[in-house]
Swiss-Prot record:
Subunit organization: PSII is composed of 1 copy each of membrane proteins PsbA, PsbB, PsbC, PsbD, PsbE, PsbF, PsbH, PsbI, PsbJ, PsbK, PsbL, PsbM, PsbT, PsbX, PsbY, PsbZ, Psb30/Ycf12, peripheral proteins PsbO, CyanoQ (PsbQ), PsbU, PsbV and a large number of cofactors. It forms dimeric complexes.
HAMAP family linked to this entry: PSII_PsbA_D1
Taxonomic lineage: Bacteria, Bacillati, Cyanobacteriota, Cyanophyceae, Nostocales
Protein's recorded name: Photosystem II protein D1
Known function: Photosystem II (PSII) is a light-driven water:plastoquinone oxidoreductase that uses light energy to abstract electrons from H(2)O, generating O(2) and a proton gradient subsequently used for ATP formation. It consists of a core antenna complex that captures photons, and an electron transfer chain that converts photonic excitation into a charge separation. The D1/D2 (PsbA/PsbD) reaction center heterodimer binds P680, the primary electron donor of PSII as well as several subsequent electron acceptors.
GO MF annotation: an example: iron ion binding
Name of encoding gene: psbA
Length: 360
């Protein structure tokens, strides 16, 4: 009797690595996009934390007046930020090896570029990873489409806007008060509140919040009773159950009578598509608006648009907003220019809309 032993061919290390990377059985899916996403997001996070805590002041305006943003230099969680790279650097790519020393790199705000480039690349890979996992599970690709809205917004404020303005010093600072400063200056220079695409974004965000609250409250109010009065309603649902957990007919009837019939969805699929599409489209438009304002295609200008029969200006709310814009423009970067161009180029503007009567 003879026995034949057949040696099993072993898969190569690369084949086993590929199988592990693309396996949907892992607790957390990695995927090929994840191979790039993980190191880039780790690098961005590590640099952000270190810079937020200990980075030295940055010469953001390029006029040798450094601005401190880290905790060690006296800031707190609210006032602290990773300060954008210097206006002296402009749009130049500024990695560590381009600086003469590490001190120079820190002084010119090099950490800001390191963080935003790795962050944007990592977020883009996260979007690709969403698509990749959906593809491998046989799902439709709309999750990554929805995620493209916040990714477009981040790309607009961190990359497109600095490119349009000619310097990464105009990018959004990485901090709470820095974000507010960016918003105020953006309004002063571009009148974003009167830009139609920003208005669509406001409708998308606030409308999405409203619709989410309406949907959640309607579903919670029309749950199918599966528990007693002494048990939590949440015990009435078992993960993976085939039965509906709420009565969509009851919810449809309630909302249809509360407003009118056709204001209520009678199709669960179209309802949830609407809940996803409304805020996503709104945020898309805002990102597009910021990207156009980056190249100074600004919001509407209704300044001094109402005049009387003798040609005198009748002040409107648009003129009040314009005064606020001018004030904000004067206050920011106050040492970087001799006189704000918006004020120097226009006619003399009185401080008050009407001169007060002084009885002395």
């Amino acid at each position: 009797m003879t026995t034949t032993l057949q040696q099993r061919s072993r898969a190569s290390v690369w084949d086993r690595f590929c199988e592990w990377i693309t396996s949907t059985e892992n607790r957390i899916y990695i995927g090929w996009f994840g191979v790039l996403m993980i190191p880039t997001l780790l690098a961005a996070t590590a640099c952000f934390v270190i810079a937020f805590i200990a980075a030295p002041p940055v010469d953001i305006d390029g006029i040798r007046e450094p601005v401190a943003g880290s905790l060690i230099y006296g800031n707190n969680i609210i006032s602290g930020a990773v300060v954008p790279s210097s206006n002296a650097i402009g749009l130049h790519f500024y990695p560590i090896w381009e600086a003469a020393s590490l001190d120079e790199w820190l002084y010119n705000g090099g950490p800001y570029q390191l963080v935003i480039f790795h962050f944007l690349l990592g977020c883009a890979c996260y979007l690709g990873r969403q698509w990749e996992l959906s593809y491998r599970l046989g799902m439709r690709p709309w999750i990554c489409v929805a995620y493209s809205a916040p990714l477009a917004s981040a790309t607009a404020v961190f990359l497109i806007y600095p490119i349009g303005q000619g310097s990464f010093s105009d990018g959004m600072p990485l901090g709470i008060s820095g974000t507010f400063n960016f918003m105020i200056v953006f309004q002063a220079e571009h009148n974003i509140l009167l830009h139609p695409f920003h208005m669509l974004g406001v409708a998308g965000v606030f409308g999405g919040s409203l619709f989410s609250a309406m949907h959640g409250s309607l579903v919670t109010s029309s749950l199918v009773r599966e528990t007693t009065e002494t048990e939590s309603q949440n015990y009435g649902y078992k993960f993976g159950q085939e039965e509906e957990t709420y009565n969509i007919v009851a919810a449809h009837g309630y909302f249809g009578r509360l407003i009118f019939q056709y204001a209520s969805f009678n199709n669960s699929r179209s309802l949830h598509f609407f809940l996803a599409a409304w805020p996503v489209v709104g945020i898309w438009f805002t990102a597009l608006g910021v990207s156009t304002m980056a190249f100074n295609l600004n919001g509407f200008n209704f300044n001094q648009s109402v005049i009387d029969s003798q040609g005198r200006v009748i002040a409107t709310w648009a003129d009040v907003i314009n005064r606020a814009n001018l004030g904000m423009e004067v206050m920011h970067e106050r040492n970087a220019h001799n006189f704000p161009l918006d004020l120097a180029a226009g006619e003399v503007a009185p401080v008050a809309l009407t001169a007060p009567a002084i009885n002395g």
